[in-house]
Amino acid sequence: HGIFDWLLAHVTCCGEWLFAFLTISFVYWIVDKKCGIYLAFNYFLGILINQFIKITACIYRPWVLDSRIHPTASAMKMATGYSFPSGHTAIATSIWGGLAVKFWNNKVLRYSFICLVLLVGFSRNYLLVHTPQDVVVSLILGIFVLWGNLKLLDWIDKGKNRDWVVFGAVLFVCAVLIAYTELKHYPIDYFNGKILVDPLKMTRDSYPKVYMIIGAFLGWILDRKFINFE
């Protein structure tokens, strides 16, 4: 496919964690703190929900389900864990979709960010690392996360110590995710005497995600209580 392989391989990078971190940091420190916090909530709570669903559904990647599917090598390197729902689409929706929400009155920015979300989702299908349902479900979940976090942050700001409630809830859910990751049963399928997908490799994504989420919310609560960065 030539140029399209190259182009969409770069587009899909906009749904990776590094781009998310850089964007959140830039917006938080330089553009607008409240907008940065909104993006951070979208990203971290979005990947928390996404990971719960991934290890619950345990759906294999397309090339595992059908040997006729051959993704590009570069895309496969970042396609870790189970397939459903799409993590890249979740990240793209949380960051670029979040920016579309915050800059809704600017039509150019709004539609540019929305198009970027859709392009990342399409790139996951084009590069053959996700099925359409992986992308669509992740997109729908992401929209609910965008809406829910607007309500959640508004609720936090209108009451005393509600930030502690949210922080405690996040710690509890993270602990549940780790316990669930360790204790649940995972499918083990064989082909020609070999394990198709090693469950241990599929579950490793839970741990760094939990550590990132705890670290981010710890920084958030410390800022609210002691630093109050303007």
Q: What are the residue ranges of the model-derived segments?
A:
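The first (N-terminal) embedded transmembrane alpha-helix
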Residues: 10-22
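Short, strongly hydrophobic alpha-helical membrane anchors
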Residues: 1-6
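Membrane-embedded catalytic cores of phosphoryl/pyrophosphoryl-handling enzymes
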Residues: 7, 23-24, 28-30, 47, ...
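Short secondary-structure transition/capping motifs
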Residues: 12-13, 37-42, 82-88
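Membrane helical hairpin/interfacial module
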Residues: 30-63
